Amino acid sequence: MTSLVVAIGNPGRQYVWTRHNVGFLCVDRLVQQFPGVHFKEAPKLFSDIAKVESSQGSMVFIKPRTYVNLSGKAVLAVKGYYNIATDRILVIADDVNQPFGNVRLRQSAGGGGHKGIKSITQSLGSNDYWQLRLGIGRPQRENVELSDFVLGQFTEEEQIGIQSVFIEASALFSQWCSGTQTA
């Protein structure tokens, strides 16, 4: 059985350390657990893809090259190409509705206003996939627009704290892989 792990983020160097790209950063660390596995461009699937074969089946990791708001286009293309069941999809994304550092794993969840999640749900015609949501919090100052906040760089303090988020996310990812997660 093939599983799909989707990182939500924006392509391009200027976005690497932005809050909206925490999904890309997390998936990069997850893929590092598999020696010799690297992302490769797959233009026809609108993604960078890394594939892992294990005793539990195949796992396809993607970083869509469509920008956050159009993530569903890439997810639908990869899902169709590899014939992946919707309930075998895990989407890793930032979450402004959770305090910085909170990590949640849920199935069949709403989008919480996240346009990338909304795009995926619309493209799949279902929300019966898993979400690993990484809390990035909200702006501390009232005069900061939410879009500027999510596209803003992590502070030095957040860059240090994000390492703990990745450790917790990795543990929840392992539970999801083994089927021992709770929704």
From Swiss-Prot:
Entry GO CC: cytoplasm
**A GO molecular-function annotation:** peptidyl-tRNA hydrolase activity
Query: Which is a GO BP term held by this UniProt record?
Result: rescue of stalled ribosome
General function of this protein: Hydrolyzes ribosome-free peptidyl-tRNAs (with 1 or more amino acids incorporated), which drop off the ribosome during protein synthesis, or as a result of ribosome stalling.
**HAMAP family attached to this UniProt entry:** Pept_tRNA_hydro_bact
What PANTHER family does the annotation carry?
PEPTIDYL-TRNA HYDROLASE (PTHR17224:SF1)
Provide the family line. Answer: Belongs to the PTH family.
Indicate what this protein is called per its UniProt record: Peptidyl-tRNA hydrolase
| Provenance organism | Chlamydia abortus (strain DSM 27085 / S26/3)
Q: What is the lineage of its organism?
A: Bacteria, Pseudomonadati, Chlamydiota, Chlamydiia, Chlamydiales
